[in-house]
C-alpha cells in the first residue's frame, strides 16, 4: 500500500469484468520500497512459513488477484491482493511470528466523501520477504500501545483519484507471535508482498518507483504463496471475484505484463512522473479472466474517458489483435471494445504508441482507419 509514498484510496469499480467493488489502495507512488528487514532476522528457510490466516477464512468473500485495473488511480495492474470481506469488520492477526517495522496512518479528504483515516502495517516474517497490509481500519489496542503516536514523519498532501491524501509514518521494531491481534478490517484489506529473491521484468526499469531496492517493484510477489497447507490452498480457492474464479495460471495474477517491442504493458504520458498513475495507459489482460484484453485508460485521452475497455483478443490479424502481438511499427490496429467503443492503436516506435477512440460501430475496412488530431501518444 504505501512505502515511501504509495497511498491507499477507497475507490470503486474494480476489474475489467465489470463488477463495481470497493477496491482499495493507493494511487500514490509505487509499491513497498525503501524498507529493509530488522537486524538479526534470519533469511527464509522454507518455501512456506506463514501458519495462520490473516483473517478467518469464513470472513473472506473473495480475493482479487494481482493485476487488478481500476483507472485512473489504478491505471496500471496493481501490485497487491484485495481481500474482500463477507462481514463489516474482521479481526486481523499476525500470520506467523513476525517483526513489524513500520506503521502508517493515511488521512483522506475531499471527493465528496467523509474524511477517512486508515492504516498500513509493514512486517517481515523472515529477512527475504516483506509483507504490507493496507486499509487496516483500526489498530488493535495492545498493538497500538506498542506503536505509540503516529504524528511525527508526515509527508505533504497530494491529490489522486479525486481525493487528497496525507501520510504520517513511524518506524518501529515490534515482535508479534502468530495469531496476535494487529487490528480490524473495514470492507477490504490490501495485502502486498515483496521477495528480494524474486525478479520480475519491466520494459523500462527506470520508470519504477524503486529500481534497485531489495523490496521494490522488481520484487513483487504473491503473499498467498507463503502460507503453509491447507491455509494457502484455502486462500487460493478464494482468488477471483463474485461469480468468477481465477483458474488460469498463475492463479494469483500477474503484475508485470510488459512485452518489449510490442504494445503490451504500461505506457506513460510523456513528461509525466510515474506516479500518480492517473494520466497513463495500460494495455493488459484482466486479472480474473485473463482471456480478456483490457485498455486501462487514465485521464489523458479525450476520446476515451477514464475506464476499462475489454475485448476478446486474437493472435493474428489487424482487428482485436492481442497486445503481445502488436509489433509492427506504423501498422494501425482496430479494436471493438466494451462500452460501445472502437479504438485505434499504432506503434509509432518500439517505445512510443498512439491511441484514439473513434466511437461505436464495426472496425470495417482497414483502408478507412485513420487517426485525427485528437490521437494521443504515450511512451514506455
Where do the model's predicted regions map?
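Bacterial N-terminal signal peptides that target proteins for export
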Residues: 1-12
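Surface-exposed, glycine-biased beta-strand/turn segments
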Residues: 34-127, 175-178, 187, 212, ...
Amino acid at each position: 500500500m504505501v512505502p515511501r509514498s504509495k497511498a491507499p484510496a477507497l475507490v470503486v469499480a474494480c476489474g475489467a469484468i465489470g463488477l463495481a467493488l470497493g477496491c482499495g489502495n493507493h494511487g500514490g507512488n509505487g509499491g513497498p520500497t525503501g524498507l529493509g528487514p530488522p537486524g538479526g532476522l534470519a533469511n527464509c528457510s522454507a518455501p512456506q512459513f506463514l501458519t495462520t490466516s490473516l483473517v478467518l477464512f469464513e470472513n473472506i468473500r473473495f480475493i482479487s488477484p494481482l493485476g487488478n485495473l481500476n483507472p485512473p488511480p489504478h491505471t496500471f495492474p496493481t501490485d497487491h491482493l484485495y481481500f474482500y470481506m463477507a462481514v463489516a469488520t474482521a479481526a486481523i492477526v499476525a500470520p506467523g511470528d513476525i517483526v513489524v517495522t513500520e506503521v502508517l496512518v493515511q488521512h483522506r479528504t475531499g471527493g465528496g466523501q467523509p474524511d477517512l483515516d486508515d492504516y498500513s502495517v509493514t512486517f517481515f516474517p523472515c529477512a527475504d520477504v516483506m509483507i504490507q497490509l493496507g486499509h487496516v481500519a483500526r489498530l488493535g489496542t495492545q498493538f497500538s500501545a506498542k506503536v505509540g503516536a503516529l504524528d511525527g514523519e508526515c509527508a505533504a498532501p497530494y491529490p489522486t483519484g479525486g481525493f487528497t491524501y496525507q501520510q504520517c509514518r513511524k518506524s518501529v521494531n515490534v515482535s508479534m507471535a502468530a495469531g496476535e491481534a494487529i487490528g480490524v478490517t473495514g470492507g477490504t484489506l490490501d495485502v502486498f508482498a515483496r521477495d528480494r529473491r524474486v525478479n520480475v521484468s519491466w520494459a523500462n526499469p527506470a520508470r519504477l518507483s524503486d529500481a534497485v531496492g531489495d523490496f521494490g517493484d522488481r520484487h513483487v510477489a504473491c503473499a498467498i504463496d507463503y502460507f503453509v497447507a491447507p491455509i494457502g490452498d484455502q486462500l487460493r480457492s478464494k482468488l477471483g471475484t463474485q461469480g468468477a474464479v481465477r483458474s488460469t495460471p498463475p492463479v494469483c495474477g500477474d503484475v508485470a505484463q510488459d512485452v518489449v517491442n510490442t504494445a503490451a504493458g504500461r505506457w506513460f504520458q510523456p513528461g509525466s512522473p510515474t506516479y500518480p498513475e492517473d494520466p497513463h495507459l495500460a494495455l493488459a489482460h484482466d486479472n480474473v479472466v485473463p482471456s480478456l484484453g483490457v485498455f486501462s485508460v487514465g485521464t489523458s485521452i479525450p476520446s476515451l474517458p477514464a475506464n476499462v475497455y475489454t475485448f476478446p483478443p486474437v493472435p493474428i490479424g489487424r482487428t482485436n489483435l492481442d497486445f503481445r502481438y502488436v509489433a509492427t511499427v506504423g501498422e494501425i490496429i482496430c479494436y471493438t471494445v466494451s462500452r460501445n467503443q472502437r479504438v485505434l492503436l499504432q506503434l509509432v516506435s518500439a517505445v512510443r504508441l498512439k491511441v484514439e477512440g473513434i466511437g461505436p460501430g464495426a472496425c470495417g475496412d482497414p483502408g478507412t482507419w485513420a487517426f485525427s488530431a485528437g490521437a494521443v501518444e504515450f511512451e514506455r
